[in-house]
């Protein structure tokens, strides 16, 4: 289990992980690592929250929020943000399904992708600032938001098909079963409940689950399935929806 965690941490983040800690794990077995996603999100959110706490006293709430969002993006190598941008470029191109998928593979940033990045990053900064000004525990909020967003991404993997013939997303999409999905969502719910007592965290997770489920169905209808890019988009939007639900 520990080897699986380190393999997933290395796979979906840019945090340094010694290669020997995940050696011997077959790439085809990575789908089992979905249950570690909430824990990895918890770690990323906690680091981002610590950055906010350290900087808040020095440079104020808005800049602390800016740098915490920046650190979160750096820890993932902009992986999920890139997926969000590619998804928006493809989906909002209003082309055929095959052409949308081609556009999503284009490394160039389009207008829709650029607007999506600006909106999501700016919205995160503003929502974090507002929550901090209300006296909310930002460390706990970010840890819960990142755990829940990565946990609910399982909703785009379970009983979905991969929209392409090959790609990194194919490791998870359509490869996880109902038990893995329930365990992943259950862990995310536990983290949300413990970090944000009084049912606030669980309620925000329910809102996030509904939003991500609807997103998955819309993408399925538009693209014929999911891709690694749509998973990244779901994680980014899941973080934002969770934080918005706490306002």
Swiss-Prot record:
- For this chain, the annotated S-S bridges are none
Q: Which Pfam families match?
A: CobS
What cofactor does this protein call for? Mg(2+)
So, what pathway does this thing act in?
Answer: Cofactor biosynthesis; adenosylcobalamin biosynthesis; adenosylcobalamin from cob(II)yrinate a,c-diamide: step 7/7
Q: Which GO terms describe its biological process?
A: cobalamin biosynthetic process
Q: Which reaction does it catalyse?
A: alpha-ribazole + adenosylcob(III)inamide-GDP = adenosylcob(III)alamin + GMP + H(+); alpha-ribazole 5'-phosphate + adenosylcob(III)inamide-GDP = adenosylcob(III)alamin 5'-phosphate + GMP + H(+)
The EC number of this protein is: 2.7.8.26
Q: How is this protein positioned relative to the membrane?
A: Multi-pass membrane protein
Q: Name one GO molecular function term.
A: adenosylcobinamide-GDP ribazoletransferase activity
- PANTHER family in UniProt: ADENOSYLCOBINAMIDE-GDP RIBAZOLETRANSFERASE (PTHR34148:SF1)
NCBIfam families found in the cross-reference section: cobS (TIGR00317)
Family membership noted in the UniProt record: Belongs to the CobS family.
Question: Per its record, how is this protein called by name?
Answer: Adenosylcobinamide-GDP ribazoletransferase
Species annotation: Shigella boydii serotype 4 (strain Sb227)
């Amino acid at each position: 289990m520990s080897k699986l965690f380190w393999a997933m941490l290395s796979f979906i983040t840019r945090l340094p992980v010694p290669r020997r800690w995940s050696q011997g794990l077959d790439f085809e077995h990575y789908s089992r690592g979905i249950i570690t996603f909430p824990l990895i999100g918890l770690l990323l959110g906690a680091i981002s929250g610590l950055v906010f706490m350290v900087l808040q006293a020095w440079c104020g709430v808005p800049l602390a929020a800016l740098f915490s969002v920046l650190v979160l993006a750096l820890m993932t190598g902009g992986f999920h943000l890139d997926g969000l941008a590619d998804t928006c470029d493809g989906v909002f191109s209003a082309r055929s399904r095959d052409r949308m998928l081609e556009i999503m593979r284009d490394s160039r940033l389009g207008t829709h992708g650029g607007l999506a990045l600006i909106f999501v990053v700016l919205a995160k900064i503003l929502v974090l600032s507002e929550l901090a000004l209300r006296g909310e525990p930002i460390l706990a909020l970010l840890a819960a938001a990142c755990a829940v967003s990565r946990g609910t991404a399982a909703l785009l993997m379970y009983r979905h098909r991969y929209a392409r013939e090959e790609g990194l997303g194919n490791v998870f999409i359509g490869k996880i079963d109902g038990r893995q999905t329930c365990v992943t969502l259950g862990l995310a719910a536990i983290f949300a409940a413990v970090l944000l007592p009084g049912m606030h965290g669980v309620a925000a997770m329910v809102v996030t689950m509904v939003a991500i489920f609807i997103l998955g169905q819309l993408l399925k209808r538009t693209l014929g399935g999911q891709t690694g890019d749509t998973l990244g988009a779901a994680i980014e939007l899941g973080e934002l929806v969770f934080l918005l639900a706490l306002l």
